[in-house]
């Protein structure tokens, strides 16, 4: 998570520096792991923290390009691609089901990918219900 996104949440800040502190407390782990800690509960803003192993070696830029292509193409209106620092309060009222946080993408050892995506767990879902009803009408 970008340090520039931290102040935007003001009294509702959710991100912590716990992952960075691990390398300071256990120097043998410095540079060997990465992560994020998120405080809960949150209001409507929610975060998906997804880590997966992929079949081939990839870069951060390749992962972000694939997500951008999906957001601009077949997932337009459902997936939003974000290039700005973002926190939970930024997505309140956003109709997208997923706001991909491109600044937080990381790739470890070439095949372990970590992505973050935010969503308004009330409004985003409501918009998908309306989409489904419109298809049925």
Where does each model-flagged region fall?
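Glycine-rich phosphate/pyrophosphate-binding beta-alpha loops
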Residues: 39, 118-125
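Short intrinsically disordered coil segments
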Residues: 68, 131-132
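C-terminal substrate-binding/catalytic lobe of Rossmann-fold NAD(P)-dependent oxidoreductases
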Residues: 1-112
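Short, hydrophobic alpha-helical segments
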Residues: 54, 133-137
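C-terminal catalytic subdomain
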Residues: 128
């Amino acid at each position: 998570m970008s340090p520039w996104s931290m102040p935007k949440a003001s009294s509702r800040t959710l991100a912590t520096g716990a992952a960075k502190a691990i390398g300071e407390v256990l120097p043998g782990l410095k540079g060997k792991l990465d992560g994020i800690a998120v405080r809960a509960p949150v209001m409507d803003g929610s975060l998906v923290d997804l880590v997966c192993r992929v079949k081939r070696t990839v870069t951060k830029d390749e992962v972000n390009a694939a997500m951008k292509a999906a957001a601009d193409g077949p997932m337009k209106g459902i997936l939003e691609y974000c290039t700005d620092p973002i926190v939970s309060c930024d997505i309140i009222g956003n109709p997208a089901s997923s706001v991909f946080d491109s600044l937080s993408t990381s790739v470890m050892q070439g095949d372990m990918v970590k992505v973050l995506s935010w969503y308004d767990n009330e409004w985003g879902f409501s918009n998908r219900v309306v989409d489904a009803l419109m298809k049925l009408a």
